[in-house]
Amino acid sequence: MTVYVLCHGGLGNRLHCLNTALAISKILDTQLVVCWPVTYECGIAFRDVFDTDIEEILATDIQPTHGYVRIGLIPDHITDYPQFKDDLPILLVSVTTSHRFMMSFRNVDVYFSDHKDRPLSDMKEFLETFRFKDEHVNRADEFVQKNSPYATLHIRGTDVPFIQTEMDLMKTTAIQHMILKKGTIRGNLFICSDEKKYEDELVKYYHHAVVRQDKTYPSKRDENLPFLTDKGEYNIFRTSQDVAEAIIDMLIMSRTCQIYGSTYSSLARFAHFIYRHKNPDHTWAFYEHVQHA
């Protein structure tokens, strides 16, 4: 049996899915193959994220001329991976139940990974197998060496309707509460978001706050619509550069012992997994998801 991991959704979902699939492939002592389509949610190629020997297969006939697709909406997209039509037994690892239809293939079993779980594979093994490219690691290292962040405040602004207006941002007490409830932060507070306005505003209100000055931010697919429409459809376009910025943010987060999130963030959770792996004696380190007040 071959273990295929279908990486879809955003970067955080994909990292957790890879982690789960790696663990399963080790347990079964079988080959792991990665399917990493370039999509609106994650516009970076697999080989631009990692230096790895893991095999990758490319989808056929689903990439429009501009190179980006929405996956998971039309079942036929998955069947355009010809390997899934073979008779060889396949275990497909997916991060959501949106590909339940794959279970109808007689040669395919499906395992749905839940990124809320603790990592199934040893993080040491994950980081050795999927080595983040030096260009991302070096930029994160440079920021950490210069700013020495102790804690992270991570705000998702584009695809989660957490803070709708500037006034809401000013009135938010949840963020202030989560900073104070654990006691005084012992060093710099790294503030990161996928919307610049949140970084610009929050850095004014917290002493010892630091932000990355050289990053870019995601853009809208339709400028006339908000990032998240009333119907819940994503109006977001994360280019390769945008995802690279998220990787760097995640790597910086993974150097901080306290991570506060404005919404549930699979990316922040993964950063915390890395920190706990590299600092096993820091039992007081935590990731906390704090709701909007």
PLM region descriptions:
Residues 4, 31-36, 152-154, 190-192, ...:
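A structural signal for short, well-ordered beta-strand segments and their strand-loop junctions
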Residues 15, 19, 246-291:
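A donor-sugar binding/catalytic signature common to diverse glycosyltransferases
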Residues 36-42, 195-197, 290-292:
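Short beta-alpha junction loops
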Residues 130-131, 235-241:
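Short, flexible loop segments at the rims of nucleotide/cofactor-binding pockets, characterized by
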Residues 155-158, 184-238:
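Catalytic donor nucleotide-activated moiety binding site of glycosyltransferases and closely related
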